[in-house]
Each structure stands twice: as structure tokens, then as C-alpha cells.
Design a protein with these regions (language model features):
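Gly/serine-rich nucleotide phosphate-binding loop at the start of the catalytic core
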Residues: 1-63, 69
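Structural motif
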Residues: 16-24, 123-128, 383-395
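Glycine/proline-rich, flexible active-site/cofactor-binding loop segments
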Residues: 40-53, 137-160, 289-294
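Short alpha-helix boundary/capping elements
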Residues: 33-38, 49-52, 66, 104, ...
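Single, function-defining residue in the core of a domain
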Residues: 1-13, 91, 108, 148-477
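Short linear interaction motifs
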Residues: 23-26, 75-77, 117-118, 380-381
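Contiguous, well-ordered alpha-helical segments that form the cores/surfaces of helical PPI scaffolds
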Residues: 26-32, 137, 398, 402
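Active-site-proximal, Lys/Arg-enriched surface segment
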Residues: 64-157
Length: 477
């Protein structure tokens, strides 16, 4: 187990131009995998028994110039492809994308803006000030036990005003377009892929960008998403006799929701495994044109399941309807990953801020300039971009930490049970949960280091550990 962690973390050494930066990368990533609380980098110092002097060095690491965020992400993609048991649908890997919003009260944190949360959870306020992230993961494991390994989590909104700044890497595209771009960047490493998204991402800009990316490229990526119940598509235009004028691009309009009644005799019945249970459902598949001024041919699958009606949409006309239904049932896995990132590793508990960032005004009028628009000094802009870089580096480390924990859970399936680690009233079936695996690592980390003194990560951690003196009073029984 510990040698696998060593292999994963050692594969990132080429991403750092200084040995010290690589050492702090190893310590911080391992610390995120086993820390017992979410009180900043001090939790890493406590759980790994490091010297108190490490505190400032660990903070400085996030602002160091000795690493490239792009290279670290690319190395993480390659590491996942090399070491992780990835799930495949035919010849396609399965990517999952979604957005996640995190509340932030800091007035000088770049990228914070007013956001609307559409959720049925009464604990979530409708409006918050915080960060809007785009998360991307890949399915790993088998059909009976799988996890969504986080590949990247990037800021997708709130930073558009920095797009024209010098040395800025911020994209000026919308959230849905950036999600497609992030997925295709990952697909270049994992080869042909299917991207699962929720209905928010079924839009003309997203489909246009996907067509631009896959045209003329060897890597192919398809998209499976959900359509709104009010979705309207179009039949193909009927062939017409040659005459003057532009030929029609679309045919008769079709309200997809009405097909549940008008075509109910054409629905097929099937049984399949959905969300871990064998279920009965009815479905109907039809290929139609969709998108104003785009009119791209999509495959729509109408599904009746437990009294609910859903409409799925896919860009592939060769994908089996039942495969689309099963694939979309895996989309919720990224929601589970977001939950574990929040509750276990504390990935969204960062608080990077900059004194060069103008104070955020919660009551700013629309006619007044935004906070980032007020920054004109080049030095201040550079410091703000460094803060954004630190935030995304923290998210990258959290993805690596959580992905490694998930892979350990999959590798130890059948060998390690939750009951052997800690008591749980309802232990997870199959693989050990991420929280239980982190508890196991936290409990046995020093035993692992003692059993593997020659490993690279063991030596890097021991160099920074504090050698405390033994107090006689503590030996009294």
C-alpha cells in the first residue's frame, strides 16, 4: 500500500525544478490524504509530526515559481492512466464533468462573486458569494464497484476580467465551454472518451466547441447529457425539387415531451442494473436535429422509470440507447467525489487572499466597476494571478490526494473490510469508503514508514520530522 503511494507521488518529480519544492509537494499531498482535521496546513504538521518551522515553507510552496500547474495536471493524467484500473465502455473511457460552488466570505479573495444555487437542499441559501469551479473526473473500477477519480478542478467564473492581463492563463470562455475544453484536454491523454454532463451543459456553444475540437483530430470524444422537459428538436428536412433559394436546414418541430404519449406504443421494455439495483424501464430512441442555427443531429432517448420521465441526449448516433441510459446513471459519481473532497480532505477549505485585491463590495451597483476592473498596476495584477494560481494548486493537490485514496480503496477490495478499520453503523458494501481508508492511513502511517525506510517519501518526511525528547512523566502508568 505504502509503496503504491510512493510510486504515484514519485512520478511527479520531473514537474519541479527544485528538490525542495518536490519535497513539500510530497508532504502536502500525503498530509491531505490522512489529516484528522481541516484547520489549514497546521493539520499536516500535526498528523505527520513535522517541525513547526515547516509552516511558512509550506505556505510559500503554493506561491513558488518552481512548478507549472499545467505540467502537474498532465502528469496526473498520465499517472492515472498508468496505475489506475480505469472503467471502459467499449473502446471509450468515461469522463464526468460538473460544476461546484463554494461559499467564501473573504473580501480580498480573487474570483469571488455572487452566485445563485439551484438546490432542493434547505441548508443551502439561494444566493452566496463564492467561487464557481468546474470539476472533471474519470470512472475507475468495475461495474460493481467504481469511483470517479478527480482529474482537475479549475476556477471557471469570476476571473474573466483578468483574461487580457499580462501572463494570464485565465480563459474568457463560458463555464460550459471551459468544461468541454477541460474534458478534451484530458481525452488527449486517455484517448477516445465519452463525456457525461447534466442538462445544464446541453447548449449550442458547448456543441459547437466540441465539433471544433474533434474536427481533424485523432482523439474522438462524444457527449451524453440530459435534455430539459421543454426541449424542442426538429426532423430532417424533406428532399425538395431543385428550385431557387436556400435549401431548408430543418424540418418539422418536435416537442420531445409529447412523444411520451404520441409514441407510447413504440416504447420498448427492458431490465438493467441502475444505481446498484435491477430495475424495469421503458425507452424510445429517435435521432433529431437540435440547436438554433446549429441543427446538429443528436440521439434522444426517452425513458420512463419509476413513474418519472427523462430525456437523454447524445452526440453519438452509434451508441446503443441502453448504454446511454446506463452511462448517465454513473454521472452522480462525481457528486460523491465532491462530497468526499469537502468532508474528508477539506479541498474547499482554502483561504488564499491578496492585499492587492480591492475589497469586495457586496452591495456594488451594476453601473460601478467590478473589483478586478479597478486593478491597473502590473505588480498588483501579478500578485493577484499568483493567488489564483495558489488556489488552483491547492485543488490540484486535493485531486491527487483523493484520487490516490480512491485507488487504494479499489485495490484493497476483498482484502480489507471497513469493520477491520473502524466501527460504522452502515459500512459500505464492496470497496472501503474514502473516509475509512484515510482513517486507516492515519492510524498506520508511522508503521508503514518504519517498514519501508528506503522509500523516497519515507526519507523526505523523516527529514522534516521533529525529534521530540521523551518526558519521564509521560512514561508513568
Amino acid at each position: 500500500m505504502f509503496d503504491f503511494i510512493d510510486k504515484v507521488l514519485s512520478s511527479f518529480e520531473s514537474c519541479f525544478s527544485r528538490k525542495a519544492a518536490f519535497r513539500w509537494f510530497v508532504i502536502l499531498t500525503l498530509g491531505l490524504m490522512l489529516r484528522s482535521d481541516k484547520l489549514g496546513v497546521t493539520s499536516v504538521i500535526r498528523d505527520l509530526a513535522l517541525k513547526p518551522d515547516c509552516y511558512l515553507s509550506m505556505l510559500h510552496f503554493f506561491h513558488a515559481s518552481s512548478w507549472s500547474l499545467h505540467r502537474i495536471r498532465q502528469c496526473w493524467f498520465q499517472t492515472v492512466l498508468r496505475f489506475f484500473p480505469l472503467y471502459q465502455e467499449g473502446d471509450f473511457h468515461v469522463l464526468i464533468g460538473d460544476g461546484v460552488k463554494q461559499s467564501k466570505e473573504g473580501r480580498r479573495i480573487p474570483g469571488v462573486k455572487k452566485l445563485c444555487q439551484e438546490s432542493e437542499n434547505s441548508a443551502k441559501p439561494q444566493f452566496i458569494h463564492g467561487h464557481m469551479f468546474g470539476g472533471l473526473g474519470i470512472l475507475s473500477g468495475s461495474i460493481h464497484s467504481m469511483a470517479c477519480v478527480p482529474l482537475s478542478i479549475r476556477l471557471h467564473d469570476g476571473l474573466q476580467d483578468t483574461h487580457d492581463w499580462e501572463s494570464s492563463t485565465v480563459s474568457g470562455a463560458s463555464h460550459v465551454v471551459q468544461m468541454v475544453e477541460d474534458a478534451y484536454l484530458a481525452a488527449k491523454t486517455f484517448a477516445n472518451s465519452i463525456l457525461l454532463l447534466d442538462r445544464y451543459f446541453l447548449s449550442v456553444p458547448a456543441l459547437k466547441r466540441l465539433q471544433e475540437l474533434i474536427s481533424g483530430e485523432a482523439v474522438h470524444m462524444e457527449m451524453v447529457t440530459k435534455a430539459k422537459c421543454s426541449c424542442t428538436a426538429f426532423e430532417k428536412p424533406a428532399p425538395r425539387k431543385s428550385r431557387r433559394g436556400r435549401p431548408p436546414k430543418k424540418g418539422k418541430a418536435v416537442r420531445l415531451k409529447n412523444l411520451f404519449e404520441s409514441h407510447k406504443e413504440q416504447f420498448r421494455e427492458a431490465e438493467m442494473i441502475l444505481y446498484g439495483k435491477k430495475e424495469k424501464l421503458r425507452y424510445y430512441s429517435i435521432d433529431l436535429l437540435w440547436g438554433q442555427k446549429l441543427y446538429q443531429e443528436l440521439r434522444f432517448v426517452l425513458v420512463e422509470y419509476h413513474g418519472t420521465q427523462s430525456i437523454l441526449a447524445g452526440t453519438s448516433l452509434e451508441l446503443d440507447p441502453l448504454s446511454m441510459i446506463r452511462l448517465y446513471s454513473y454521472r452522480f459519481r462525481i457528486e460523491c467525489t465532491f462530497r468526499e473532497l469537502k468532508q474528508q480532505t477539506g479541498a474547499f477549505g482554502y483561504h488564499f487572499w491578496s492585499k492587492y485585491m480591492p475589497r469586495l463590495d457586496y452591495y456594488r451597483k451594476k453601473t460601478e466597476p467590478a473589483a478586478l476592473e479597478q486593478v491597473k498596476n502590473d505588480h498588483a495584477r501579478m500578485k493577484i494571478l499568483q493567488t489564483v494560481r495558489a488556489i488552483e494548486m491547492h485543488m490540484a493537490l486535493s485531486c491527487i490526494a483523493m484520487g490516490t485514496v480512491q485507488c487504494l480503496s479499489l485495490r484493497t477490495e476483498g482484502k480489507l473490510r471497513t469493520e477491520q478499520i473502524r466501527y460504522q453503523r452502515t459500512p459500505s458494501k464492496g470497496k472501503v469508503s474514502e473516509g475509512a481508508m484515510m482513517h486507516y492511513l492515519r492510524k498506520h502511517i508511522f508503521r508503514f514508514m518504519g517498514q519501508n525506510p528506503a522509500l523516497r517519501i519515507t526519507r523526505l518526511i523523516q527529514e522534516m520530522q521533529e525529534q521530540s525528547e521523551i518526558c519521564e512523566d509521560l512514561l508513568a502508568s
